């Protein structure tokens, strides 16, 4: 087992900090103290996806960042995606992924691929990297400790009110039992959650990772929900970054089509989390190295903040 992550483990802290560029390190150290005090003991849910999961430098940087958050007394919980990895695996079996309203259509064969890729390959890679740098990560799916109970999602057909679209084994969260996550946090572990839910009869369901992250933040009463993506944040139709969005403004962006595709479940989940009492919800650019640390430990504004009012 990896060394315990606490103040008595300076080796892990040194490993996590050493790879950060000197200028960035100085900035973080100068600004971090009030944020460390503010968020000490608080839960930070991180939706991990996009280039940050596929580019080697960003992957290693993310692992160090999560460890550093744990070392300074926060409780990071990672919920990961894996769209590109699923697409690649589907290609190998002669299938092409299709999406409806940002949700992956999931037939039986696709569900098997999703389980193997998310609950196996992707999760193990994240856990291995965190442990490699001195952290203690544990991988979970919805089956572990009854974490995520799900049922088949009823996707409303926007063109035919009252009708639904069958998108296969895509899950709608019925309940989250946070006991296993809280137990891991209490023992200084970092939970890494694959977005796969299970019904009472054992049927696996593919659940959008943004949806799982938002619901997990709500149930855990998280201080922050940070969603990492491949764009600077929410953009308007001219490509300008919208740094702050209220619930009313989000509804307008939904209505005029500015927010569409894969951003639909992301923004909906972010807004639901904010309305549920998560104090701070941010969508940030995961392509920027150490963007997670910069968002949490410095005054530097990143991405888009989602507000419930």
UniProtKB/Swiss-Prot annotation:
GO-annotated molecular function: acetylglutamate kinase activity; ATP binding
Biochemical pathway: Amino-acid biosynthesis; L-arginine biosynthesis; N(2)-acetyl-L-ornithine from L-glutamate: step 2/4
Enzyme Commission code: 2.7.2.8
Residue(s) at site: Transition state stabilizer: 47, 266
Record-linked CDD domains: AAK_NAGK-C (cd04250)
Enzyme class: transferase
Cellular component per GO, a single term: cytoplasm
Localization in the cell: Cytoplasm
Protein residues bound to substrate: 82-83, 104, 206
Name of the molecule in the record: Acetylglutamate kinase
Organism: Cupriavidus pinatubonensis (strain JMP 134 / LMG 1197) (Cupriavidus necator (strain JMP 134))
Gene: argB
